[in-house]
Amino acid sequence: MVICLYGASSEKIHPDYITGVEALGRAMGRRGHTLLFGGGDKGLMGAAARGTKAAGGAVIGVAPRFFNVDGVLYPHCDKFYYTDTMRERKQILEDQADAFVAVPGGIGTFDELFEILTLRQLHPAGGGFSQSAALR
């Protein structure tokens, strides 16, 4: 299963969240799931990627080209999609995922989460958008 994770890219996050999201990533990797995420190396995005990779899972990043500067993107992705815009990034995340998980984050995380919840409401299961969504 390809699981899209939305979460903080900031390093200004409580260490307990980092620990918890790394554990979530390890659990995903152990179960053979693939992490699909915004490609960030820091914050909860990076924690999820490190945890998933440490447990042998695959990691796919998606980010606009303008984020491709030293230290911003997770360097150990199995595959990386570069986009021209944030909207294209969100579309790839939506199209490629079987399920979505939102962990603590900021405005970007809320934007991504609310779009998924809106799609679920507008297209109930069987109506074109049947992926699952969860908050952690």
Q: Which residues does each predicted region cover?
A:
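Conserved phosphate- and dinucleotide-binding cores of soluble alpha/beta proteins
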Residues: 83-95, 99-136
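A cross-family phosphate/adenosyl-ligand binding-site feature
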Residues: 1-96, 135
